[in-house]
Amino acid sequence: MNILKVGMVQQSCSNDIPANIEKLKSNIRKCAELGAQLVVLQELHNSVYFCQHEEAALCDLAEPIPGPSTETYGALAKELGIVLVLSLFERRTAGIYHNTAVVIEKDGSIAGKYRKMHIPDDPCYYEKFYFTPGDMGFQPIETSVGTLGVLVCWDQWYPEAARCMALNGAQMLIYPTAIGGVYTDPVEEQKVQSDAWQLVQRGHSVANGLPVITVNRTGQEDDPTGNTKGIKFWGRSFATGPQGELLAEFGNDEEGVKVVEIDLDRTEYVRRGWPFFRDRRIDAYGETILKRYGK
């Protein structure tokens, strides 16, 4: 067995960014105290989910990488001796911004980053206004605790993204996330959507024989314009083993931390029994898989 202890931080956020960061730092410390070697945070964790409406001035929230957040969290990672997965609003250059996951090594250095590839543009999720699609492909990030296939939120609905990370050598899939129910959907539909959200990621776990770590935010965040009822984030952060089995799960409204043990050697055992990679017919898929809309 090759056990990796992974910490997950699920929390709500407010408009007070310094307070959000202090809350995150406290929860990261709690994970470390519980033995976590790797800690994963939610999508855009420093602030509220600002993409509920379009406002150019909100681009002032973006920061360079490396920058203030990588310095702050890097110092904490070095102090605690942990690997840390961040999710930041990256300012690449004037007018070009990305939704970027950053992996911090135990020594506080940047191990690598991933720019979100799939960008939504739906009611309350107007991300295309803020984020340029990623241009770094689906390359896992090498760290002292393993090879991490880091993706971001909307990427989690696409089996191609998970498969690319798996084929490129990821030992686990990690999804910082900000997703919840919006005013246009009845409560019953939101429950169906929430279950589907978890189910599709458990499917990626099964299809690729990899553990999945998904960290979502929780709480109600109002629409600053008052035009909608805002978003009630689902919470439900979870971890699976390589057969999609649930190892840990937060409640919808639960705030705090969980530390889960992941056996990185189990992928070998599972893939021997379910040799999906062996039986793929890459000779037969041809250009069909490249079609955008099908027939």
Where are these regions (language model features)?
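Active-site-proximal beta-strand elements of phosphoester/diester hydrolases
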Residues: 3-13, 100, 113, 140, ...
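Short, glycine-anchored, charge-dense loop/turn motifs used at functional sites
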Residues: 6, 103-111, 238-247
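Cys-nucleophile CN-hydrolase/nitrilase-fold catalytic domain and related Cys-dependent amidase chemistry
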Residues: 17, 26-106, 110-113, 179-203, ...
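Short beta-strand scaffold segments in enzyme catalytic cores
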Residues: 86-88, 100-103, 139, 237-239, ...
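Residue-level detector of high-confidence beta-strand sites
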Residues: 100, 113-115, 249, 259
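A short, polar/charged loop-to-alpha-helix boundary motif
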Residues: 116-130, 254-271
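Cysteine/selenocysteine-centered motifs that mediate thiol-based redox chemistry or coordinate metal-sulfur cofactors
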Residues: 138-168, 177, 267-295
